[in-house]
Amino acid sequence: MANIKSKVKSIAKQEEFRQRNNAMKTRVRKAIRAAREAVLAKEEGFEKKVFEAHSIIATAVQKGVYHPNKGARKSSRLDHFVNEQKSKQ
């Protein structure tokens, strides 16, 4: 445990950010999973879930949870999956 007041505050702040980042990463994973499942199940309006997943990924990048390249990679892989499934139909 830190003895210096500023370090105690810093540790508390880092813990806050860690929890916030983990929550955002969970949102991204759930959105991608929901979009992929909607595509596989051939649900009506799966495009909306894909759009929502892209939006959540972009938000995570804006908030600094993900590096921009990682966000782009996640979006690209989701698009690739969707296009692959469309071509199979």
Curated annotation (Swiss-Prot):
Q: Provide a Gene Ontology MF annotation, just one.
A: rRNA binding
- In this chain, composition skew of type Basic and acidic residues spans 76-89
Keyword RNA-binding set for record:
yes
GO CC annotations on file: ribonucleoprotein complex; ribosome
Alphabetized, the UniProt keywords read: Ribonucleoprotein, Ribosomal protein, RNA-binding, rRNA-binding
Q: Where is this region: Disordered?
A: 68-89
**Which GO BP terms sit in this record?**
translation
Q: Does the keyword Ribosomal protein apply?
A: yes
Question: Pfam families, alphabetically?
Answer: Ribosomal_S20p (PF01649)
Query: What function does this protein fulfil?
Result: Binds directly to 16S ribosomal RNA.
Which HAMAP family does the UniProt record give? Answer: Ribosomal_bS20
Report the sequence similarity comment from the record.
Answer: Belongs to the bacterial ribosomal protein bS20 family.
Q: Supply the name of the protein.
A: Small ribosomal subunit protein bS20
Organism of origin? Mycoplasmopsis agalactiae (strain NCTC 10123 / CIP 59.7 / PG2) (Mycoplasma agalactiae)
Q: What is the lineage of its organism?
A: Bacteria, Bacillati, Mycoplasmatota, Mycoplasmoidales, Metamycoplasmataceae
